[in-house]
Amino acid sequence: MAASRPLSRFWEWGKNIVCVGRNYADHVREMRSAVLSEPVLFLKPSTAYAPEGSPILMPAYTRNLHHELELGVVMGKRCRAVPEAAAMDYVGGYALCLDMTARDVQDECKKKGLPWTLAKSFTASCPVSAFVPKEKIPDPHKLKLWLKVNGELRQEGETSSMIFSIPYIISYVSKIITLEEGDIILTGTPKGVGPVKENDEIEAGIHGLVSMTFKVEKPEY
């Protein structure tokens, strides 16, 4: 079974996409939100995955689709209620991810006190890079992330600026959701989120490790 489910292709069989909101203070400020004492969590379905080579699909119901650049932590084995001190033992690797967000829809959901599902969980709302093995990143809190739209730099941030550390997040999430091998946790976005439109090209990367490119398209249905 392990041979038929390589962790390097987690997006083909991983079950859970767990996302953390408001984890960079500069992004919290740009969104005019409050810094909370615990992580904000939401989920995406596995059909949200868009590996490089496939398009980002812009839902017909949004006029304001935003990019959010995030480090994804890929779980290497099952974990439930793990202590923070042991949390990194359960990590299998990493990937660069985008949390594509229908911002206008999210704003309406916030006003009405509704979940963010329509804004965050649509098909192809989670573009992902190639898998980066854990061994290539000794300290995930010392990474530089960047994103460009049509060649223009939009986002640039350092994972050292996270409010909640990766071990804390894993421990916190695992006390609520049993995490399985192949699951991924998106750890939040730095400042600079902004709109994209049909035919835009998004390039993003982790300095010195991995990069990815996606085109924005409208679905045919």
Curated annotation (Swiss-Prot):
GO terms for cellular component: cytosol; mitochondrial matrix; mitochondrion; nucleoplasm. One of its GO terms (biological process) is oxaloacetate metabolic process. It is found in: Mitochondrion; Cytoplasm, Cytosol. Mg(2+) binds at E68, E70, D99. Gene3D superfamilies: Fumarylacetoacetase-like, C-terminal domain (3.90.850.10). It catalyses: oxaloacetate = enol-oxaloacetate; oxaloacetate + H(+) = pyruvate + CO2; a 3-acylpyruvate + H2O = a carboxylate + pyruvate + H(+); acetylpyruvate + H2O = acetate + pyruvate + H(+). NCBIfam families: PRK10691.1. This is Oxaloacetate tautomerase FAHD1, mitochondrial.
